[in-house]
Structure formats: C-alpha cells, structure tokens
From Swiss-Prot:
Tissues/organs with expression: Widely expressed, with highest levels in ovary, testis, epididymis, preputial gland, vomeronasal organ, liver, salivary glands and heart. Also expressed throughout the brain with highest levels in the olfactory bulbs and medulla. Detected at similar levels in gonads of both sexes.
Region of interest (Disordered), residue spans: 1-31, 152-171, 207-289
Organism: Mus musculus (Mouse)
Encoding gene, per UniProt annotation: Dmrta1
Polar residues compositional bias, start-end: 217-242, 269-289
GO annotation, biological process: male mating behavior; ovarian follicle development; regulation of DNA-templated transcription
InterPro entries with a match to the protein in the record: DM_DNA-bd (IPR001275), DM_DNA-bd_sf (IPR036407), DMA (IPR005173), DMRT (IPR026607), DMRT5_1_DMB_dom (IPR046472), UBA-like_sf (IPR009060)
Entry protein name: Doublesex- and mab-3-related transcription factor A1
DNA-binding region location: 86-133
DMA domain boundaries: 314-349
Organism lineage string: Eukaryota, Metazoa, Chordata, Craniata, Vertebrata
Effects seen without this gene: Mutant animals are viable and fertile, with no obvious anatomical defects. Ovaries from mutant females may have an elevated number of polyovular follicles. 25% of mutant males consistently exhibit copulatory behavior toward other males.
Amino acid sequence: MERLPHGRRDRSGGCRPHLAPGRAAAPASAARSVSSGIPVSATFLRPPGLFLRSTASSGRAGCAPGPGLDRALGAVGCGYPRTPKCARCRNHGVVSALKGHKRFCRWRDCACAKCTLIAERQRVMAAQVALRRQQAQEESEARGLHRLLYQGSSGSGAQASGGSGRTESPQVLNNPMAVAVLGAGASRHPGSRSVPTFEVFQQDYADRKQEPKQRNCESCQSRQEEPVSNTHHHSLGSSKGNVTVEKQGFMSSIPEHPDKSTIILSPCPTDQSGGEDSPRSFSSSDLESGNESEWARDYIATRASLSTVTSRPRDPLGILTRIFPGYKHSRLEGILQFCKGDVVQAIEQILNGREHKPDCRDLARADLENAAFQRASDFSLAGIGFGTLSNKSALSPLEAASAAYGGDSTLYSFNPRLAFSPLRLAYSSPGRALSGFVSPYLTPGLVPALPFRPTLDYAFPGMIREPSHLPSKHLVAGGRLYFRPNQEHL
C-alpha cells in the first residue's frame, strides 16, 4: 500500500492515487526522484517490477509517465519476460541477475533460515517438474494406445460384418504395448470376443514356424528324388506311396555297393534314419534355426571324402617305389615278396640292409659294375685312404668285419675291400659299424636313391696331385675328394 500525497491510504487495495487536477505534474517529478534514487547496476535493462507496476497504475489514472520510464513501459506492454534474480542475494538485501551468477554468489553456501527455506523450495519445485513431465509422457502414451485400440475395435466391427476372423490392424500387431492393452480388454469383456488376442498371435507365430519346416522338407524330398529317379525309373510317380517306394529302393541299393565312391548321400538325414528316435535325426530346434542344411553339407562332404580315400586300394609296390625311387622295380618286388606283402617290414628290411640274397641276374650285373669300379677303387674320403687298407690306415679294423657283411658287399657294386655297404653307411646309427664321422651324403654315389657309377675317373681329372712327401692326413683340404696318384694316372 502506498501513501498518497494527501496522507490517505487507498482502502480499495489499488495503486490509484486521488490527485487534484492542479497537481498533475507532481507524480512525474516524484517518479523521477524515485527512479533516480534506486541503486540499479548498469547491466539492468529494466527497472524493478514493483516500480513498473506502480508507474503503470499511475499512468492509467491520468498521470503521464516520466521520459525515463518510456522504455520500461514499452517492455511491459510488449510482454518481455522478467529477468530472474538470485533469491539468496535478495534475502540479504542485494539484487543480482541470476544468469551466470550461480558460481559467483557469495551466499551460495549460506545456512540461514531463509536460504535453507529457499533450497527446500527449489528441491520441491524440481520434484514437481519431474512429476509433471512423467505424467505428460504417460498421458501421451495412453492416448496413442487408445487411438490404436479404437482403430482395432472399428476394424473388428467392420470385419465381423464381412465374416473375417482377423480383428487386429497391422499397427496393433507391431506394437507390444497395444498387444498388452488388447489382451487386457479381451479379459475384461469375455463375451465380446470368442478368441483371445494372445491366442491369435500364437497361431500366427506357429504358422510362421511351420513355413520354413515345410520348405526344408520339400527341399529334402526334391533332393532325395533326383538321384533316385536316375537309378530307379520304374518307381517314378506323383503319389506318396511311390515316393516311399523310391526311398526304400534307394536305401536298399546303398549296401549293395559299399566299395563304390559314387554313392550319393541324402542331404536330409531324417529320411535315411527311419524315425525320430535315431541318433542322426534332427531335433525340432535344429529345423527351426535353419542350421541343419549347413551341418548336412559339412557332414556329407567329410563322409564323401573319407569314402573316396578309403575305397582306393593302396599298391604296396607303388608305395615302395615312391619311398625308394632309386631302387629297381624287380628288387623292390623281390623284397616285398620276401616280406609276404608287408610294406612296413619291407621298408625296415631296406633301411636296415637286411635284404634277401639277390638272384643270379642281380649278381651278374653287380659283378660287371664291380669290375668297372676297380679302376677307381683307390680314393681318399675325408682324409682317410680307402684304396690301400694297410695296417697304418684308420679303417684297418673294419677288414675283420668284411666276413660278417660279405652278403651286403655287392650291393650297388661297392668295393668289397671297404667292408661295408652304402645302405649301411647311409642308414646306420652312430654306434654300429661306423663311428658316425663319415657323412652319408659326401658324394653322389653314397646316396641310396642314386645309382653308384664310377665317376671318380673324370670327377677331378688331374686338378690336384698328391705330393710324395705329404702324409695321408693332408690328402684332402676342406673335405674334397680327389685321386691318389698311381700307375694308371702317372
């Protein structure tokens, strides 16, 4: 309530002062003084609301507002919002704008009664705003569901008059919330509908499940009938009895040819198993998931590869020929006959050098090669003289073993004076006839896969000559092989 110029208060509660006609300019000067006396910062664009309201009320009474309040009155007339102020600062007698003021408020941590009341009020107002938002969201969802429900009910009335059994629209089918609402409505009004909504959806889902099952069975039957029609032309037909006859004929034809690799396995194992109790039949979950085709393809591929691999007979002579390509076919055949067709035993015999005695043809051929090899019988290997096995030679103790290995001395026409065979040299362990210091692949002649030829005559023709004053341990430099000078080479 404001005090009027005559000292009376307005009992009506308004701000309309009773002024005399001669004093029309007095409120203007008073307004100027009041407006200039209020401490307002330069950032404020408008004066306080109380002052604006009092000025507006005085303007309605016929008092012209001052020139400084034209902007404020224009802002109020245009409907600009009021600038929010900090409540904590207002409680302590300071007016400050709230925008950007939260961090810099000097009373933000104040715990007085007024500030505590303000904090509690802000908390309650925030809870009210959150509650209103939640209620508005629930109302909007309920409106949408009611709209869908009304559309479904209108569609059900139209289709019931036409004789159709489906009463739901596509939108209702796609919305789970609408499904719940429709189910609740059906339970509330049991007499209005004979079939509940959830049963209709279950029927649709079951129909969708049965479609891939039928497709899978049809594809299996078509794949089953193709190979059967090629082999059994007399059982072709369109009826189900003919199809079963074809399947039985195909199954009976499979065990008749177990060794052939051209047997066609059925891609549908349920037809071959003969029932659901068999371990190879697929379960309903496999059929629904659609993975039985991939599993059947992998299973058929592995079974076909195994059948083709196991059905091919292995030739033991061919196996020996691949393992020992340097051996002659007749020799390998004789070893295999001696071992009674056992490939493993024949390989062990060849590797251990315990072959049977060669026949007369092999002996004659070995004698010819041995005679040709006599020209180059004197050679040095890794610094050890094999040509003249005297008492000073390092291999002189091996001469006593020549009688024990006499049967093997003619293999590949190796020199009998060496007292060991090339096979025994190549495949012997370090603890046997040799002490392991001779490499089995120093020369091509020692490799069992290659025939031993007298190539020493022209391997190193006269490149290195042995001096007469050098001992035998300096005959080879770097493990190379060369000739010892004798009467033929001089």
